[in-house]
Regions:
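Short flexible loop/turn segments that cap and initiate beta-strands
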Residues: 232-262
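Aromatic sugar-binding surface patches on proteins
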Residues: 104, 265-278, 282
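Polar/acidic, low-complexity leader/linker segments enriched in S/T/G and N/D
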Residues: 1-71
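Short beta-strand elements
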Residues: 294-312
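Short, cationic low-complexity segments
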Residues: 196-219
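Short, aromatic- and glycine-rich surface loops/edge beta-strands on solvent-exposed regions
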Residues: 280-300
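Beta-strand-rich structural segments
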Residues: 217-236
Length: 312
C-alpha cells in the first residue's frame, strides 16, 4: 500500500519487452529484522552475483549477530496476500475521490509442525520485514539500485498473529499465520532477484539455524561432560546434537573475561560429550557456547549457550 503522491506529472510508457516473467507462487520467505542492534539497516548485498551472492546470503542466514540474521520460513501452504478495497470519498453528485489504498495482508500456513516450532514463531517482538521466495527460488524485496542492496518489505509487526490447530481425524496439525504489510509499502516497489544470479545455493534450500540446550556436569578442573540436544523432541527424549567439534564450541570464563576453544572434544554417543579445556581455576564461573554455520543447501546451522557452572 502506498499513500504517498508518486505521480510524475505524465502517464508512463506501457511497452513490455519479450522475456519478462512475473514473480511466481510464494512458497517461502525470509523474516528480516529491520534494524540491527548497531543501528544499521538489514539488507542483502547484491553488488556481485554467482559465488559472491551465495556467500552473502549464507552469511545473512548464519550471521553470528541474531539482529543481523535472516530467518527462513519454507514450505508454506495456502499463501495469500489479499488487499482490502481502497477508501473513497464521494460528494453529493456521486463523484468519487480516492483517499487511500486498501490495507494489504499476508496469510499462510505450516502443516505438520510441532508445538516446539510454534513456540519459535508465535510472537514477533521486533520490527521486521519479509523477502519473499517463489517456487523457482526467486527472491522479492525492495531494491536500492544505487546501493545495490535488496531490502525486506516492512511489516506492521503489531498485526502479526499465529495460532496452533490440533491434528484431527481428517486433517494434520496446522499453524495459520497472518500479518499486515506496513501502510507505506507497495507491491509497485517490489523487485525480483532471479535464482539465476546465484551459483551453488538455492534460496529454497537454505534452512534456518537450530537452537541447542545443554546439561553440564563438571568433572574436574578443565573438564566437563555436556549433553547437548536440540530443543525438539519429547519429555526426557530430546533429539541429540551429534555434530559438536572443537571449532564449533567455545568455553567462556566469566571470571577472567576470556574465552577459548576446547583442547579436546570426545563424543560419547547420543549428544553426550567429554570436553576438556585450559585457562581456568577452581571457583571460576564458566559457560559453554556452540555456534556452527551451514555451508550449503539443506544444511542447518546451530547455536546455543549453556547455563553457568562453577569450576571444581
Amino acid at each position: 500500500m502506498s499513500n504517498c503522491i508518486t505521480c510524475a506529472g505524465y502517464l508512463k510508457n506501457t511497452g513490455v519487452p519479450a522475456g519478462v516473467k512475473p514473480f511466481g507462487r510464494i512458497v517461502g520467505m525470509y523474516l528480516v529484522p529491520i534494524n540491527a542492534d548497531d543501528g544499521s539497516v538489514n539488507s542483502l548485498d547484491v553488488s556481485a552475483f554467482g559465488t559472491a551472492l551465495d556467500t552473502a546470503l549464507l552469511g545473512r542466514i548464519n550471521n553470528a549477530d541474531a539482529s543481523k540474521r535472516f530467518y527462513p520460513l519454507l514450505d508454506l501452504k495456502n499463501v495469500e496476500a489479499p488487499q482490502e478495497d481502497a477508501t473513497f470519498e464521494e460528494d453529493s453528485a456521486g463523484t468519487r475521490v480516492k483517499v487511500r489504498d486498501g490495507r494489504q495482508s499476508m496469510t499462510y500456513e505450516f502443516w505438520g509442525q510441532s508445538r516446539q516450532f510454534f513456540k519459535q514463531i508465535v510472537g514477533m517482538c521486533v520490527p521486521f520485514g519479509v523477502i519473499l521466495i517463489d517456487e523457482c527460488g526467486n527472491l522479492l524485496g525492495e531494491y536500492d539500485e544505487v546501493g545495490e542492496k535488496l531490502y525486506p518489505r516492512e511489516v506492521n509487526y503489531a498485526s502479526y498473529d499465529a495460532k496452533y490447530l490440533n491434528t484431527t481425524a481428517d486433517a494434520t496439525s496446522k499453524i495459520p499465520v497472518t500479518f499486515d504489510f506496513a501502510l507505506f509499502t507497495s507491491e509497485a516497489d517490489q523487485v525480483m532477484l532471479s535464482i539465476s544470479q546465484f551459483s551453488a545455493v538455492s534460496p529454497l534450500k537454505l534452512k534456518g539455524m537450530l537452537d541447542l540446550v545443554f546439561t553440564i556436569t563438571p568433572v574436574a578442573t578443565g573438564s566437563i561432560t555436556a549433553q547437548i540436544n536440540f530443543i525438539y523432541g519429547t519429555v526426557g527424549a530430546k533429539i541429540p546434537w551429534k555434530g559438536a567439534t572443537i571449532s564449533a564450541l567455545t568455553v567462556v570464563n566469566e571470571t577472567t573475561v576470556s574465552s577459548a576453544s576446547p583442547t579436546a572434544v570426545t563424543h560419547n554417543g547420543d549428544g553426550n560429550y567429554t570436553i576438556t579445556y585450559s585457562g581456568s581455576s577452581a571457583g571460576n564461573k564458566l559457560h559453554l557456547e556452540a555456534f556452527k554455520t551451514a555451508t550449503a543447501n539443506n544444511e542447518n546451522g546451530v547455536e546455543g549457550n549453556s547455563a553457568q557452572w562453577t569450576e571444581l
